[in-house]
């Protein structure tokens, strides 16, 4: 094999060669393939297709021609990159769902919104649309520069005159090397109005431009949610715009509904969207859809029908579809375009400024071109006028000349004519020698002089030129402008909140004695039959009952306050919904409790921003605090500090108030203080609080509650040895905060220390739990009503080494009330006060009772007589002691 000549071998470092070659390739892709020019909004392939259509005379008034002919001509002359890329680009320009203002008028199958491809180019035909002519208008008047094509045999435009702002009108998308562009389409009327405003006020702000240009206007219409993404994109060139389908909920008879989708987001494949919905229904990720069909047609337009089950919530299903399917998606704006041949990220104003400058250049160059042509014509007419004035001499000179060249030279010398004038005289027909033709030449000459003056005035005054640009843009707006298709919905629709996907319904959340939590619909309880009195049998490790309960909406908030002074927050729907028989899930699986942290209070709240409601806290060491409810509106999953206190202290209870209640604090040594809530100054969320009650040695707070000034409620006291009593709230006079309180029971070895102090109405049941796991349920109304100093009556018999550990209020069984076994709980009423609500807690089948206590009536009567005799003397002694303490 013959060796190559040495001169043809060029040794290069492979690293340098790779670097330079890749950079050359990258720049070629960026500049000559993937990015649009800021002036005409076209990539090279689109520009070449439109120029090829223009050169072939495929205007809207001509018949269609085969797409294969167009593609072949463009590929052969301007774009040697394969026919498929050219045809695909042309197809997209013909799709009214891809281009806001299609630039190609296609005949045949040019694809669909379902992702169907266009027919082969040998079957389809095309021509230019009317608006495309405005992109090419004046292209032959030296308005733009032409460059050589790929082989140097043809000339092609470097940019089109673009008499309307196509970059923003039709948008653009493309992926280059190291960068990409994605520009949304806009409404032509709004765009031209924006350009006009910019031309009148170069210092206009983007906010002012947005008064003319509301936002993108997609060819598939649909909705845009909010303006924040639009504003960010217009200001910085980058942003995310939320797009949503237009859907309505229709009634279809029989109490059933259907969701009808009539517009879908831009660039969404309708067929894939429907497949996604069907997949979610099949996988049971969306429930309640019974039928799904595509009724789209040329007559009705887009129409996707989703039938909804009778018992399903159509609004919730639609919100789920928005979140989980392309019914709602985003358009990522990245406004990169070629500016002076270089890729640049531009904002809205910069895009319009570059376009306006381009139009001024086009109009200026066209004016200069027209001026040159007008002056050339005037020059010819001046020669013809001279010839008509000396017609006999002209004819004689021509007759005497032997050749055309001699005649031309003779005319130039004798009449001081230019070569062009002399040639025009020689070319003049004899019929122009008539008087009528002479008048026409004179009139044309005078018109040309006026026209030349106008053109020179345009070039001499920038404002006159700018006004001409405005007039031409206004004309295009009036001819091609249309109404906005895409509706912009205001109101902060950036994301669907979880509650938008969940039906709002009344629920019950229960927290058990053993810290298991669950939720159930209120309707589940109401459907139950009455259960038996007594206690369901359980193993020792499984003994449990509902210790706290709240009723609320799935969209309401639940605040969990722990013994360590922290607060956690959940939405109602965030608590798992389980069956009635289920014991629930450990509360630590729902909220991230710290070690040794126990829920002390659970409160349901609808509006955490309320300025009229307060939370009152009480700790074991007698500290009390009042804080505005609004301080707890922003609680994260990890919880936050609700009250600060010493290490040896802990939170006992929290109550929600209206700010006008009386506070009741009770201690284990049977002291109780009552003082107005108004004496507590509202403190911050993490504040420590102030002294609520002065504790004697060894004493601690065991209960916190609230009461109205004229309350008919009673104070229930239960002691560790199983004794209890009821005393009217009004037997406890108001005193100053921080006092030692007054006696609420006589503590002896017989009844033991107080374990529970709370308010009751007399309509509740009481659940009493011992340290041995024995549980008893009894009617509060069966507990004797005694004076403050009474010891109370026996509520439960205890064995050796047993004591009462927990007491919980439960709504009593009463035939005349609800015929349901319901538990008392507190929630916020409209006036901000805590109100009693009910929900069933007993199972339908009571099971085997492990302990049922019958109160000995004779023993109780005897105890009562002894206590009544002592009550009066104890009151007198206590009042004297209290007075001395306060002094």
UniProtKB/Swiss-Prot annotation:
A motif (GyrA-box) lies at residues 528-534. It catalyses: ATP-dependent breakage, passage and rejoining of double-stranded DNA. GO terms for biological process: DNA topological change; DNA-templated DNA replication; response to antibiotic. The keyword 4Fe-4S does not apply. PROSITE patterns: TOPO_IIA (PS52040). GO terms for molecular function: ATP binding; DNA binding; DNA negative supercoiling activity. GO terms for cellular component: chromosome; cytoplasm; DNA topoisomerase type II (double strand cut, ATP-hydrolyzing) complex. SMART domains: TOP4c. Residues 811-865 are annotated as: Disordered. Residues 813-823 have a biased composition (Acidic residues). It is found in: Cytoplasm. CDD domains: TOP4c. Residues 35-501 form the Topo IIA-type catalytic domain. It is an enzyme of class 5 (isomerase). Its EC number is 5.6.2.2. The active site is at residue 123. Keywords: Antibiotic resistance, ATP-binding, Cytoplasm, DNA-binding, Isomerase, Nucleotide-binding, Topoisomerase. A type II topoisomerase that negatively supercoils closed circular double-stranded (ds) DNA in an ATP-dependent manner to modulate DNA topology and maintain chromosomes in an underwound state. Negative supercoiling favors strand separation, and DNA replication, transcription, recombination and repair, all of which involve strand separation. Also able to catalyze the interconversion of other topological isomers of dsDNA rings, including catenanes and knotted rings. Type II topoisomerases break and join 2 DNA strands simultaneously in an ATP-dependent manner. Heterotetramer, composed of two GyrA and two GyrB chains. In the heterotetramer, GyrA contains the active site tyrosine that forms a transient covalent intermediate with DNA, while GyrB binds cofactors and catalyzes ATP hydrolysis. Few gyrases are as efficient as E.coli at forming negative supercoils. Not all organisms have 2 type II topoisomerases; in organisms with a single type II topoisomerase this enzyme also has to decatenate newly replicated chromosomes. Belongs to the type II topoisomerase GyrA/ParC subunit family. This is DNA gyrase subunit A. It comes from Staphylococcus aureus (strain NCTC 8325 / PS 47). The lineage of its organism: Bacteria, Bacillati, Bacillota, Bacilli, Bacillales.
């Amino acid at each position: 094999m013959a060796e190559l000549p040495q001169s043809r071998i060029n040794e290069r470092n492979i690293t340098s060669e790779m670097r330079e070659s890749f950079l050359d390739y990258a720049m070629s892709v960026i500049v000559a393939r993937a990015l649009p020019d800021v002036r005409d909004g076209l990539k090279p392939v689109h520009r070449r297709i439109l120029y090829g259509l223009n050169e072939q005379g495929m205007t809207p008034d001509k018949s269609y021609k085969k797409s294969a002919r167009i593609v072949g001509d463009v590929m052969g002359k301007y774009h040697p990159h394969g026919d498929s890329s050219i045809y695909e680009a042309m197809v997209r320009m013909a799709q009214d769902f891809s281009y806001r203002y299609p630039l190609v008028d296609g005949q045949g199958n040019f694809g669909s919104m379902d992702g169907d491809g266009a027919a082969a180019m040998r079957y389809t035909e095309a021509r230019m649309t009317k608006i495309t002519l405005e992109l090419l208008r004046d292209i032959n008047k030296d308005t733009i520069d032409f460059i050589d094509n790929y082989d140097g045999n043809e000339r092609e435009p470097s940019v089109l005159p673009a008499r309307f702002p196509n970059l923003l009108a039709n948008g653009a998308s493309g992926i280059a090397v190291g960068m990409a562009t994605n520009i949304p389409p806009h409404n032509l009327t709004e765009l031209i109005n924006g350009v006009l405003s910019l031309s009148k006020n170069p210092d206009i702000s983007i906010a002012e431009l947005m008064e003319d240009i509301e936002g993108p206007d997609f060819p598939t219409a649909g909705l845009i949610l909010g303006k924040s993404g639009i504003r960010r994109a217009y200001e910085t060139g980058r942003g995310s715009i939320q797009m949503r389908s237009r859907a309505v909920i229709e009634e279809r008879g029989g109490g059933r509904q259907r969701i009808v989708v009539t517009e879908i987001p831009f660039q969404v494949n309708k067929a894939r969207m429907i497949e996604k919905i069907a997949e979610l229904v099949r996988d049971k990720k969306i429930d309640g859809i019974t039928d799904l069909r595509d009724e789209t047609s040329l007559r009705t337009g887009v129409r996707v029908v989703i039938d909804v089950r009778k018992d399903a919530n159509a609004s919730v299903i639609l919100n789920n579809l928005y979140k989980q399917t392309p019914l709602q998606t985003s358009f990522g704006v990245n406004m990169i375009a070629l500016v002076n041949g270089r890729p640049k990220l531009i904002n809205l104003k910069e895009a319009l400024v570059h376009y306006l400058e381009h139009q001024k250049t086009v109009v200026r160059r066209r004016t200069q071109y027209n001026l040159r042509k007008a002056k050339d014509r005037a020059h010819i007419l001046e020669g013809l006028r001279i010839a008509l004035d000396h017609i006999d001499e002209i004819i004689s000179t021509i007759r005497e000349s032997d050749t055309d060249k001699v005649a031309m030279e003779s005319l130039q010398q004798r009449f001081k004519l230019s070569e062009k004038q002399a040639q025009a005289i020689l070319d003049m027909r004899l019929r122009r020698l008539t008087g009528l033709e002479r008048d026409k030449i004179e009139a044309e000459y005078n018109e040309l002089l006026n026209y030349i003056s106008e053109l020179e005035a345009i070039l001499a005054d920038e404002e006159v030129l700018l006004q001409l640009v405005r007039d031409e843009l206004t004309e295009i707006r009036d001819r091609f402008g249309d109404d906005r298709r895409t509706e912009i919905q205001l109101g902060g629709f950036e994301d669907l909140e979880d509650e938008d996907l969940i039906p709002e319904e009344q629920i019950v959340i229960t927290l058990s004695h053993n810290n298991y939590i669950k939720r159930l619909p209120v309707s589940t309880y109401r459907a139950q039959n009455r259960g038996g009195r007594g206690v369901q049998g359980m193993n020792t490790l499984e003994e449990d009952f509902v210790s706290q309960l709240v009723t609320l909406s799935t969209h309401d908030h639940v605040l969990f306050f722990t013994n360590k002074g922290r607060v956690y927050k959940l939405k109602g729907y965030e608590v798992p919904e389980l069956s009635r028989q289920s014991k629930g899930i450990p509360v630590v699986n729902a909220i991230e409790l710290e070690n040794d942290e126990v829920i002390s209070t659970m409160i349901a709240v609808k509006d955490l921003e309320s300025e009229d409601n307060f939370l009152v806290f009480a700790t074991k060491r007698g500290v009390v605090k009042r804080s505005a409810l609004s301080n707890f509106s922003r609680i994260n999953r990890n919880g936050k500090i609700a009250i600060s206190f010493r290490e040896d202290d802990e939170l006992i209870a929290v109550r929600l108030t209206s700010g006008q209640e009386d506070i009741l604090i009770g201690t284990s040594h049977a002291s109780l203080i009552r003082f107005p809530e108004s004496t507590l100054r509202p403190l911050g969320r993490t504040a420590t609080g102030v002294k609520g009650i002065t504790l004697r040695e060894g004493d601690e707070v065991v209960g916190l509650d609230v009461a109205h000034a004229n309350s008919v409620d009673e104070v229930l006291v239960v002691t560790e040895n199983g004794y209890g009593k009821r005393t009217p709230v009004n037997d406890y006079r108001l005193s100053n905060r921080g006092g030692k309180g007054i006696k609420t029971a006589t503590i002896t070895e017989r009844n033991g220390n107080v374990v529970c102090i709370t308010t009751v109405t007399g309509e509740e049941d009481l659940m009493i739990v011992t340290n041995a796991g024995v549980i008893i349920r009894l009617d509060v109304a069966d507990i004797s009503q005694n004076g403050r100093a009474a010891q109370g009556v026996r509520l439960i018999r205890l064995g050796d080494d047993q004591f009462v550990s927990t007491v919980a209020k439960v709504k009593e069984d009463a035939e005349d009330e609800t015929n349901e076994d319901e538990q008392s709980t507190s929630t916020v009423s409209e006036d901000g006060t805590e109100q009693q609500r009910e929900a069933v807690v007993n199972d339908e089948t009571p099971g085997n009772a492990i302990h049922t206590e019958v109160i000995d009536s004779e023993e109780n009567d005897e105890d009562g007589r002894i206590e009544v005799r002592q009550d009066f003397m104890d009151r007198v002694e206590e009042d004297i002691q209290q007075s001395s303490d306060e002094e």
